[in-house]
């Protein structure tokens, strides 16, 4: 029997490719923080409304991912980290990604408004617009402060979850927004330290590309120094408590140790161990955010038993 290999035929998009188009890893963080915002709000929400609200917030996050992948197809194709995504790899056509992103955006916003309230829907619509237009189409390609300002897009989900429950904004929801907003720069700059060539090849003006790794290391430290007291201060809001305080103190102590280590390293050290410290800091920063929000959720879960909060 002759083994015939056919090449040059594009792969047909499958279910998994369309799921990947929605950036499920990013969506998981959005869903979790939105869920925490919803569950810790000081009101009782019907389980069906809560489930529906989270579903359409997730759909809105997926829509943002699809729109971002449509717009960034040219630079995603160049970057090693992103070239295998459905659009740059040619599995999903850019026009198809755009259509899916727009359709899901409309469905998510309208249905969230009908199922919960107009304020939450308006906040979701603004978040999609901010991520797809303000960040993806403008900031990402024009300024090294792209992830500082653009980080607001990823910080809105807990505010949307809170708004689903309460119909408004509070000090607590603003704190959750601020926590993610201040976490975003050191998280992504630590990634940029060991992925500099990817951003440079694609022409993305990340801080490592425009100002170099030395300046970026200093920025990681400065933003970590700003983030740590903010995170600890959350213990003294209506969603904080002793468990959150202990968690925040431990995590932010570790954060500052890691940030100082990054700041003190020179390029010879980093290249010698293939950016081991920077990669470790990046991975830790993911756990950092999940554990902070997990502690917030735990405080709320313990309150009915007289154990959560102060």
UniProtKB/Swiss-Prot annotation:
Signal peptide: none
Source taxon at top rank: Bacteria
TM annotation in the entry: 21-43, 48-70, 95-115, 118-138, 147-167, 174-194, 220-240, 243-263, 289-309
Coiled coil regions, renumbered to chain: none
Membrane topology qualifier: Multi-pass membrane protein
Compartments where found: Cell inner membrane
UniProt xrefs under CDD domains: PT_UbiA_Cox10 (cd13957)
EC assignment: 2.5.1.141
Annotated GO biological process: heme O biosynthetic process
Pathway named in the protein's UniProt entry: Porphyrin-containing compound metabolism; heme O biosynthesis; heme O from protoheme: step 1/1
Cystines in this chain: none
GO CC term (a single one): plasma membrane
Catalytic reaction list: heme b + (2E,6E)-farnesyl diphosphate + H2O = Fe(II)-heme o + diphosphate
Pfam families per UniProt: UbiA
Additional detail: Carbon 2 of the heme B porphyrin ring is defined according to the Fischer nomenclature.
Subunit structure: Interacts with CtaA.
Purpose of the protein: Converts heme B (protoheme IX) to heme O by substitution of the vinyl group on carbon 2 of heme B porphyrin ring with a hydroxyethyl farnesyl side group.
Family of the protein in this entry: Belongs to the UbiA prenyltransferase family. Protoheme IX farnesyltransferase subfamily.
NCBIfam families per UniProt: cyoE_ctaB, PRK04375.1-2
Name of the protein: Protoheme IX farnesyltransferase
Organism this protein belongs to: Cereibacter sphaeroides (strain KD131 / KCTC 12085) (Rhodobacter sphaeroides)
Gene: ctaB
